[in-house]
Amino acid sequence: MVQRSKSSANWLREHFNDPFVKQAQKDGYRSRASYKLLEIQEKDRLIRPGMSVIDLGAAPGGWSQVTSRLIGGQGRLIASDILEMDSIPDVTFIQGDFTQDEVLQQILQAVGDSHVDLVISDMAPNMSGTPAVDMPRAMFLCELALDLATRVLKPGGDFLIKIFQGEGFDMYLKDVRSKFDKVQMRKPSSSRDRSREQYLLGKGFKGA
């Protein structure tokens, strides 16, 4: 218990001293994660006015805020998370466990017959600190997100997902490369140095 309290205190200290946390509060973003997407956007120009986008693992809404602003009123954004998320204007939010078929069907129903231009995912499982447990959970979410992307993306569409280096990564990378014309890795400066997270970007979906 003492160790946990010490760890929690260290996290809180790091959190409140984090310049991106302070900047998010100043800019009105719900989380520091907004700057990860903004940095990737600055480099890759993924999000454009009028696009249709799916945001997985959306809560508390940092990526949805950025995306909604960039796609504008003519765009369409469907966001989903197992956690609650305060509403964002013009964003369709589906709360539920993405690994459950019922929630997946709700997302597919919201997409309808018109496919989307971009699928983004900042999903991560609750980490136990044990890689042998955490990596399979993380890769399972990545695999489900890729499966959804291949069902809803237009040919030429793009896919951005948080991923962790470890067991299963190389096979997943190979799978994404088979489905997209170009695959790149991104590590935004706003991603903490000690974090093993990276972002995998697949551009130019080859079609189902």
From Swiss-Prot:
Belongs to the class I-like SAM-binding methyltransferase superfamily. RNA methyltransferase RlmE family. S-adenosyl-L-methionine binds at G61, W63, D81, D97, D122. It comes from the Bacteria. Its main location: cytoplasm. This is Ribosomal RNA large subunit methyltransferase E. The active site is at K162 (proton acceptor). Gene3D superfamilies: Vaccinia Virus protein VP39 (3.40.50.150). The gene is rlmE. GO terms for molecular function: rRNA (uridine-2'-O-)-methyltransferase activity. GO terms for cellular component: cytoplasm. It is found in: Cytoplasm. HAMAP family: RNA_methyltr_E. Coiled coil: none annotated. Its EC number is 2.1.1.166. Specifically methylates the uridine in position 2552 of 23S rRNA at the 2'-O position of the ribose in the fully assembled 50S ribosomal subunit. Pfam families: FtsJ.
